[in-house]
Amino acid sequence: MTADKPRETKAQTPERVGERLLRIGVILAVAAVGFQTLAHLTNEFLLDDRVEGLDADVEGNAFTWAGSAAVFAVAIAALLHFVAFRERRREFLLVLGVATLFSLDDATQIHERIALKVGEDLLGLPDYAAVRLWLLFYLPLLLLMGALLWILAEHVWGPGGRALRLGLGLLVASIPVEIVGLVTRPLSEDGHEAPDDLRVAVEEGLELGGWVLAAAGLTAAVAVALMRFRQD
């Protein structure tokens, strides 16, 4: 009998671990967006919008939870970096605070309630216009978060920073798609539902994919930084 040869294993370098985390993040983003889009369009075009659990535009279902969890993952990654390192602590603390607020808001629909209260009750706007006032109310926070993520992407591990910026790009792209609802929602109320159904699928997909990629990029960057620190 011959002795078994020891298996050759690749060293778990920080970069290798970071790349693995990024691959997982990309796969998760594609799978989540694909499933959400397929479920939403199936419900709208084949099930006549009868299943609220499959509607990406309905608050309080599994898709809401997924979006809120993705935002909270960004907050957790920022917290880990804030606790472990002294570099860019102020920026990571701000990301932690804003991402936590966004996650809570996404789960409880605070922004929509405020927008509808002001838009409908005070300004007399139709609901499809009133609900989009949240973009104005939250504009300072949106700009702050975008600037923070862009800045941090320059100072973290390269591939993680690129994933972070890609996620940010998807989130920015979702805003004009949201605004298009000012046109497609009235069409939906007049019986032409397909344009708004497709718009919702695109908007929600961009948001979910953007937050998942941002979380994956920041998590991978923090993991690489922690492993490098341990090696030193």
Regions of interest found by a model, annotated:
Residues 2-232:
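Hydrophobic alpha-helical segments at protein termini of multi-pass membrane proteins
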